[in-house]
């Protein structure tokens, strides 16, 4: 798989979580240089849909497809827990027609502290690129509900065209009531509906 250079015909590329290359150097750094990423970059630049979850988000940032960086968590500890997030439903494919604004997703990361320069932050705010915020159960953002120190409680961002989304929370871990919740299945069902 690490020698592949061409993407098959696809509607959506998903870069999942999973500590690629053992997270040596920086999370996502080595994976961002893998051969297939040239094709992923071309696909994204031509308007193709790319979703990065956790380590996938780190890879997208390291490859330059998304702005900013993901640093060590504020308290330098691995975080593994459920969090509430608020999504930005304005003008994007990923959350179009989704029924709710506030979700409960799982996080599991050591380097999920989103950071960007002041100029980058102004840019992503002006372009409505903040996709997901950490929040409380009512959608209020504050440092108290920011698990990792991310600037502005950012849990996910879009590129300028909004065809690329990176997010630290794991929707795939919340797809069944017996596995602590179904909010992730709402996300994926909506995504599939939007792809049709």
Where are these regions (language model features)?
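N-terminal beta1-alpha1 cap of cysteine-dependent amidohydrolase-like domains
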Residues: 1-53, 59-79, 86, 122-125, ...
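Conserved beta-strand and immediately adjacent loop positions that scaffold enzyme active sites
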Residues: 56, 84, 104
């Amino acid at each position: 798989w690490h020698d592949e250079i061409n993407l098959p015909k696809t509607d959506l590329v998903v870069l999942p979580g999973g500590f690629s290359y053992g997270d040596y150097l920086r999370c996502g750094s080595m994976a961002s240089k893998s051969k297939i990423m040239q094709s992923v970059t071309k696909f994204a630049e031509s308007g193709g849909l790319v979703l990065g979850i956790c380590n996938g988000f780190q890879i997208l940032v390291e490859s330059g497809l998304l702005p900013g960086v993901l640093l060590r968590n504020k308290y330098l500890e691995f975080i593994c827990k459920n969090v509430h997030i608020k999504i930005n439903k304005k003008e994007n494919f990923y959350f179009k027609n989704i029924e709710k604004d506030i979700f409960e997703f799982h996080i599991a990361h050591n380097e999920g502290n989103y950071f960007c320069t002041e100029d980058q932050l102004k840019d992503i705010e002006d372009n409505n690129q903040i996709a997901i915020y950490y929040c409380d159960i009512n959608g209020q953002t504050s440092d108290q509900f920011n698990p990792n120190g991310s600037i502005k409680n950012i849990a996910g961002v879009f590129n300028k065209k909004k065809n690329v989304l990176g997010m630290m929370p794991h929707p795939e871990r919340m797809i069944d009531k017996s596995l602590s919740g179904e909010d992730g299945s709402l996300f994926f069902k909506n995504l599939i509906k939007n792809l049709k």
